[in-house]
């Protein structure tokens, strides 16, 4: 019965052209939802010119994975319409179902062959289904945007337990887009694409978004000194590096990336992302606005620059995470 209801609510798709703005972040700032939205941008490393942008302005679903458990939460009525088919496909994994949420539990494969373990049904199949089996489509939709944590590997392999840290980002969290923004800087164009189970509501919403002006440019940041606090002091980090060099010499490992975390005050993460974009334009730049966190970064990043003339060293962050906690 649930799948019959789902099939009766066939989604509609629509597009709208909107005024172009060379600062895609300004359009995003004006049009995107205050939570559960994301901005992806690309720039040429050599010329530093912006190339294109893709942003999730509104999400229908939020998919969050902790270990072997995946929670799919509907953020809109359109998102609710996707839950029955998901429930039908993964009924053998379903452990909880409410009006706006469905929770699925998977298990770690114990097959002796590594390839078979990777091919076994896993939490990632939820994402694959939402991307590949959607009953709506447009040039950009369906679209899922989000991120994987390093610890997600532990859902495929048995690894030593890692102590909880200050970073509470889940194993993965993805948004299933309902309204997206696309900006082509080379052509000087921008447009919206969206889907919904109510055609009239969809078109009215796109018309409303298309009529909104872009957000005002932020004031130039004040060049004040900020204090960064490291989780490992300089002496401790040097000791870690010396120990790892010994491990390489002994043949225990052949490659390693020692790292430490720095904490700074970040009252405006979107402004900080814009500053990073200005100083380090990259092919892959991202700003993610979750329910209780913001995540941004650039890749490939200029991690370290050395000027031999004045012997100045500059460090650049590759990923920044802010939390309301």
Label each residue range with its predicted role.
Residues 3, 7-323:
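Extended alpha-helical targeting/anchoring segments
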């Amino acid at each position: 019965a649930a799948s019959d209801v789902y099939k009766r609510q066939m989604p509609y798709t629509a597009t709208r052209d909107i005024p172009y703005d060379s600062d895609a972040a300004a359009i995003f700032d004006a049009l995107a939802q205050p939570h559960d939205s994301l901005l992806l941008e690309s720039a040429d490393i050599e010329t530093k010119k912006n190339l294109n942008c893709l942003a999730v302005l509104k999400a229908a679903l939020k998919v969050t994975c902790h270990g072997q458990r995946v929670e799919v939460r509907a953020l809109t009525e359109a998102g609710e319409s996707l839950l029955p088919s998901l429930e039908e496909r993964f009924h053998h994994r379903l452990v909880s179902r409410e009006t706006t949420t469905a929770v699925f539990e998977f298990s770690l494969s114990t097959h002796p062959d590594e390839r078979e373990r990777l091919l076994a049904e896993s939490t990632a199949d939820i994402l694959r289904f939402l991307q590949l089996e959607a009953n709506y489509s447009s040039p950009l939709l369906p679209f899922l945007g989000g991120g994987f944590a390093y610890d997600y590997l532990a859902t495929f392999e048995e690894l030593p337990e890692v102590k909880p840290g200050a970073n509470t980002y889940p194993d993965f969290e993805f948004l299933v887009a309902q309204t997206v923004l696309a900006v082509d800087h080379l052509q000087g164009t921008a447009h919206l694409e969206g889907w919904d189970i109510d055609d009239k509501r969809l078109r009215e919403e796109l018309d409303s978004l298309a009529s909104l002006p872009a957000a005002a440019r932020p004031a130039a940041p004040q060049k004040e000194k900020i204090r960064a606090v490291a989780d490992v002091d300089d002496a401790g980090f040097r000791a870690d590096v010396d120990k790892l060099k010994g491990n390489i010499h002994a043949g225990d490992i052949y490659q390693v990336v020692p790292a430490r975390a720095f904490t700074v005050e970040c009252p405006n993460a979107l402004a900080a992302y814009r500053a990073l974009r200005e100083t380090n334009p990259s092919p892959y730049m991202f700003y993610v606005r979750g329910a209780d966190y913001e995540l941004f970064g650039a890749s490939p990043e200029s991690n370290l620059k050395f000027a031999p003339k004045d012997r100045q060293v500059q460090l650049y962050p590759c990923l920044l995470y802010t939390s309301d906690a």
